From Swiss-Prot:
Gene3D superfamilies: Multidrug efflux transporter AcrB transmembrane domain. Disulfide bonds: none annotated. This is Protein translocase subunit SecF. Keywords: Cell inner membrane, Cell membrane, Membrane, Protein transport, Translocation, Transmembrane, Transmembrane helix, Transport. Pfam families: Sec_GG, SecD_SecF_C. GO terms for molecular function: protein-transporting ATPase activity. GO terms for cellular component: plasma membrane. NCBIfam families: 2A0604s01, transloc_SecF. Forms a complex with SecD. Part of the essential Sec protein translocation apparatus which comprises SecA, SecYEG and auxiliary proteins SecDF-YajC and YidC. The chain crosses the membrane at residues 27-47, 152-172, 180-200, 207-227, 253-275, 285-307. It comes from Rhodobacter capsulatus (strain ATCC BAA-309 / NBRC 16581 / SB1003).
Length: 333
């Protein structure tokens, strides 16, 4: 006998429009707040966006990240990230670590020029050899403010490019009203994540940008499922009011939406608890993104489409249907 876990019944009849203005209004308010908060409070940019120095160390003894971190704390270097590098090509007694240190206030340290850059490396080497005499610094490099500024703009353009591509896909797959609803939902998810990072002053670096891109993919996947069912129901229930068709479509896909979110959280929560500092920012953003993505799929995207309206009297067979037909039209009454 097969065991099936059901968090939500297959057939539900919730009225997702009952508190329409409250749920949609809350989303708009949070989006506006998420734009203002980073400007007022500021984001806690990581080394990728502030600039800093990366030091590569090598030792014949096993690496203890906690011991390394404790040894560097008296130096008061600010943001320090220590990670062990593993590679099958390494010898059995070859242990490599990467140490990333934020740009110091007393000097740029860019490209390791001058006494200041070398002084930083010497301080780190002295502190670490005290706890691991076999340790050697094999290389180091620095990222200056100019390069880190370019990384910020690259991150922004990558998010904008992803949004444009997704909007084009939804436009071709469905209609422009659906594309606009999906993009507003994506912007909602990204802005709320950035706003939360500003409020909590969590480290915002390239891994966070990767999480934002992943959130957009997760969110659009949820939204497309709802929109696809909505399109099928619009053909099936031609005389039903648009609001009722939308509510029916959300109810019919609710079980899938909840199960997808729960299974994703089952993988993310253990990583958030035991994954360590290196990936904690990425995982935290993803956990938050699961909730915002689910909320936007249910309460944001459909409200945009409802507000704009759909022309249900036009001919259903668009050119796009030739490429993306799922057979729903053939079996529709």
């Amino acid at each position: 006998m097969a065991f099936r876990l059901k968090l939500v019944p297959e057939k539900t009849n919730f009225d997702f429009f009952r508190w329409q203005w409250a749920t949609f209004g809350a989303a708009i308010v949070m989006m506006i707040a998420s734009v203002i908060l980073p400007l007022v409070i500021g984001l806690n940019f990581g080394i990728d966006f502030k600039g800093g120095t990366t030091i590569r160390t090598e030792s014949t003894t096993a690496i203890d990240v906690g011991v390394y971190r404790a040894a560097l704390e008296p130096l008061e270097l600010g943001d320090v990230i220590i990670s062990e590098v593993r590679d099958p090509s390494f010898r059995e007694d070859q242990h490599v670590a990467m140490i990333r240190i934020q740009m110091q206030e007393d000097g740029q340290g860019a490209e390791g020029q001058g006494a200041q850059g070398q002084e930083l490396v010497n301080k780190v080497e002295t502190a670490l050899t005290a706890v691991d005499p076999a340790l050697k610094i094999t290389s180091f490099e620095s990222v200056g403010p100019k390069v880190s500024g370019e990384l910020v703009w690259t991150a922004v353009w990558s998010l904008l490019a992803a949004t444009v591509v997704i909007m084009f896909y939804i436009w071709v797959r469905f209609e422009w009203q659906f594309a606009l609803g999906a993009v507003v939902a994506l912007v909602h998810d990204v802005l709320l994540t950035v706003g939360l990072f500003a409020v909590l002053q969590l480290k915002f670096d390239l891994t966070t940008v990767a999480a934002l891109l992943t959130i957009t993919g997760y969110s659009i996947n949820d939204t497309v499922v709802v929109f696809d069912r909505l399109r099928e129901n619009l053909i099936k229930y031609k005389t039903m009011p648009l609001r009722d068709v939308m509510n029916l479509s959300v109810n019919e896909t609710l079980s899938r939406t909840v199960m997808t979110g729960m299974t994703t959280l089952l993988a993310l929560v253990p990583m958030l608890i035991w994954g360590g500092d290196v990936i904690r920012g990425f995982v935290f953003a993803m956990v938050w993104g699961v909730f915002t993505g689910t909320y936007s799929s249910v309460y944001v995207a459909k409200n945009i489409v409802l507000f704009i309206g759909l022309d249900r009297n036009k001919e259903k067979k668009d050119p796009s249907d030739k490429f993306f037909s799922n057979g729903a039209q053939d079996g529709a009454p």
